[in-house]
């Protein structure tokens, strides 16, 4: 969310496109080309989310407590698609309220939302969550890979469970693929994103080993782990500050994935991090995070077009943040939470139907015994 607020600003938006040639202050340079970039990371935050999602979805199955697939798939797709489609409708409504127009000298990212189509057809096409949302809600690009991972989850689980002593080698293969594919891949370089989920899956299957390793880390050393993880996560921008055309930047996802896995490990194993993340306000934001993710872009874009992109960034960040959180909370209450209830009810109904079918197909206790069965 902070990422979108920042790049809706004209100057920051040009930095995002890496065509900003004007001199930068020391503070601006630090926020863009040092690990401080993590404060408004965009794609890097998506990588963290993918690792975390792989971990969370795989953990019940790694513990042999996962639901049946006939329950998992409908429930999962309902929880993803219903709020996402509702967010497209919400975004379309915002375009009816706030006119989008090209702003001369404005943010390239913001003007993209004025030049792209934003009609009912984009709601229809975007509802696939594969493409077609135009300028309505471009954040949905990352949900495409979440859907594909959910559909392919059995394959990820089989590969993770197979030959556990090779798990480190599996992780190395994933990272090598993430590094090499953007450099030599002939088909859709963004395909590496779906590979990132596998790191979270491997972490779920090795949770005990990760917890044991975390128990041996002294408290002060966690700061080093966090710092190193952030450096790895923001590697692309650190390199860009030195050499914009360095080919290593194309392999940034592989390096960032290591940092993302490190941050997830900190959340799992560091007591201080667990206390922080379980704080009431942080837990509340986590509860509405999906709704916030789905609605923040239309809110940020709408506010930017209302102001004509003239609000100074120091004021725009808190205003847009508060507005987006408020809208996200309302969306959670009206859309996401009811969709969760519907998904759970659907899953319970499917389990009940399966149990009834299994019971009806079981041999009756009063069945006529087979010849010779009396002796057993």
Spans of features found by a protein language model:
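Aromatic-enriched alpha-helical transmembrane segments of multi-pass intramembrane proteins
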Residues: 3, 12, 27, 114-259, ...
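Structural signal for the C-terminal ends of transmembrane alpha-helices
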Residues: 58-65, 94-99, 156-165, 201-211, ...
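Functionally critical transmembrane alpha-helices in membrane proteins and complexes, commonly lining
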Residues: 1-62, 84, 289
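Membrane-proximal cytoplasmic C-terminal regulatory module of class A 7TM GPCRs
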Residues: 279, 337-374
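Alpha-helical membrane-protein architecture signal
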Residues: 34, 70-74, 136-137, 195, ...
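Alpha-helical transmembrane segments of multi-pass integral membrane proteins
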Residues: 35, 197, 225-338
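Membrane-interface helix-loop-helix regions
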Residues: 16-41, 80-147, 151, 256-267
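Transmembrane alpha-helical segments and their boundary/interface "anchor" motifs
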Residues: 41-46, 50-53, 57-100, 106-117, ...
